[in-house]
Amino acid sequence: MNARKILTVVALFSAAIAADAHASQRRFTYTQESGVIARGQVELEPQTTLLTGKEDYYTSLEQRIEFEIGLTSRLQTAFYLNMHATTEMADSSLGTDAGFDGISNEWKLKLRDPVADPFGLGLYLELSAASNEVEVESKVIVDKRAGNWLTAFNATVEPEWEFIPKDGSNDVESNLELKYEFNLAGTYFVKPSTSVGIEVRNHNLHISSEDYQHSVLFAGPVVSYASEAWWATLTVMPQIAKLKGSEVDAGHSLVTSELTKLEVRMIFGVDL
C-alpha cells in the first residue's frame, strides 16, 4: 500500500472516530441522521415544539422527554413521554387544554457511515400509543458528511389509527390518517461546535373517512451548538406553500385547518 492510500485510510478512520464521538448530537430537529449513540451510552433529550398561527387564535406547546440508549455500535433505542398544552379559540372565547399524549418507543439501525462510506444509510421505526390512538412511524435515512458540509434526506410513512367510541354502544369506530413526509436538510459547520443550515419539509396527510387531504411545504433555518457535556439545536419552520388542499382550505394560500403557519422546535441533549 503506497503512502497516499495509507494517508487516505488514516484520514477516513480519524473522521469516522470524530463523527462517532459526536453521534449523539442532532444537527437538525425535523430531519434524522443515520448516526447512533455508542453502546452503553444513555442520553436525555427534552424536545419542545411551538405551533402557532391558524385562522383563529391557536398556540400549542408539544413536549417530548426522550431517554436514548445505545445498544450496539449500529443500533439504538429510545423511550418518549409525550405531553401538550394548547390554547385556542372555541365558541368565541379562549380555552386551554393540557394533557398526557402517551408513550413512544424508537429504534434506529445504522447501515452505512456518512463519513467512511460514500453515503450514510439508516432505518428508523417509532411506535406510539395513547388512550385512543396508535401510530407507526417508519423512515429511510440518507446522509453525507463532506468536509464542513452535512446533508440529510428522510422519506417517512406514518399511519395513525384513532379509535372513537360510538354513542350508546360498546362498539368502537376506527379512523385512519396516513401521513407521509419528505425532508431535505443541509448545514455548514462554521466551527467544530457550531453549525448553521436549513431544513425543508414536505408534509402530506390523507384522512380516508373524511376524504381530506393536503400537501404543504415548510422551510426554515436551523442552528446547532455542542459542548463536551451538552448540545442544543433550534429550527424555525414556517409554512411557505400549499401544494394541495381540500375544500376547507380553498381560497387560502396556506393550510390552516389541520396545520399552523409556524413551527419552532428546540432539542436539548445531555449524557446521563
Locate the predicted segments by residue.
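Transmembrane beta-barrel domains of Gram-negative outer membranes and organellar outer membranes
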Residues: H22-L272
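Cleavable N-terminal export/targeting peptides
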Residues: M1-R26
